């Protein structure tokens, strides 16, 4: 039984821990920060998160065929922008390089012309780095290598690859190799690496070494993981004379679809955030990058603290007008965006550096972040409502307790005949017709007036006051007097189950009125006063032949019964020596031949009787 008790205790602890989750706006549940230092609760969270991660991974793998490839303009409904019809078909060439030179595991990008023009605020421009016209951006490959570049100015392709099985294979290859981003680390759990401006063979390229720029501030960033939370988009300004910003966003979920559209390059967005769980990784993701002409800007990048023990998905909302805001993160309570250190096209120095104002923003991610558990709520076991019988029993119990508390010190007289409740206190008691009532229960049946201390009439089981009885016709059914036989029109006296006029209720011996006086009756129901009753019906003493009456001032009669005879106490003596007999040893009675003797006289009487 001890084993079962321990299991029950552990289960109850687990349920109590789960009931401490606080509901958040997005439907998930967050853990109280005060419980983060509990080792048992941390172990429970770790096991629970591992199970939920497997389920989350299986669900995402099932949904990949549905979100991976669509034909024609199928993605226009998802992203709310239209794609132009395909004109020609052919391989995509970036700055003279075909897609075969990039490799099957690299990103395949396609141009796309948007209906809306990106609108960048002047405040955003002040915090972002400005690239020159023909700059190129270094992008990490899915395998974690650096060096594959995507030109930002010239896209000479006029044809787009139609969707085919090859596209599916490429997408699966990219999905399987998406973990290569883990090697592309820009920050670790202890401190940021040193970053120095690096001059590449091609000016304006941003390599992975630009994360080393965090050395200048030496900002600690614990438990920093990468979540890339945007989509890759390219704009083309050939359709209009207005300068158009070309935005480049690293995809948060790293899956690329090819569509049967020419002169359009785009990257579709799929759910692959499930690849970023496991050990705590360090990555920094760019919110949005602008390039293509001197007015293009690179927005501030940010590092998102993420606890891999609890896999979750940090989503960033996409602006419907393709605008972006630097310095803001899509996750609540995350550090503000910090601009990267990048070189301009001339390679003469960094176009923008990390501001000193941002050094205080990066703090311990454990203190800034609220952990989200991807679990369903565990409904607390609500108490079932009590049944009607239980509620009634509780009400009766409370009522009895209240009465006991209210009358614990009062005198208890008995139970009321009418309401069957206890009568406490002389001020609440009323006695009539040999029964006990509450003052509020003994009332007139017609007018409901209290009848305590007043004349009343009892007719056919009902009680009436004098006014209602005399002037309302109740006297027609009144009783007749048992002695005189007349109708009782005023007050009535009831005794022995009969009704009497008060003046007719008298002693049969002395004819004294017994209204309000103690009386008694004999076997023939004759009425006597107490004095006459004892004179006539009282037992007589066997010695003096006088009636044995009560002592003066009392109603009790004391007598001695011996040999079926009654004696006064004073008459109960030895007939020979006149010794008073009682229960004492020397005064005990020893009757012989109908005579009362003491012990000595009894022996003498026996000796004389034997001699004779």
Swiss-Prot record:
It comes from the Eukaryota. One of its GO terms (molecular function) is transcription corepressor activity. Its main location: cytoplasm. GO terms for cellular component: adherens junction; nucleus; P-body; transcription regulator complex. Residues 414-475, 479-539, 540-608 form the LIM zinc-binding domain. SUPFAM superfamilies: Glucocorticoid receptor-like (DNA-binding domain) (SSF57716). It is found in: Cytoplasm; Nucleus. Keywords: Cytoplasm, LIM domain, Metal-binding, Nucleus, Repeat, Repressor, Transcription, Transcription regulation, Zinc. GO terms for biological process: cytoskeleton organization; negative regulation of hippo signaling; neural crest cell development; regulation of DNA-templated transcription; response to hypoxia. Transmembrane segments: none annotated. PANTHER family: LIM DOMAIN-CONTAINING PROTEIN 1, LIM DOMAIN-CONTAINING PROTEIN JUB. Acts as a transcriptional corepressor for snai1 and snai2/slug and plays a role in regulating neural crest development. Belongs to the zyxin/ajuba family. Interacts with snai1. This is LIM domain-containing protein 1.
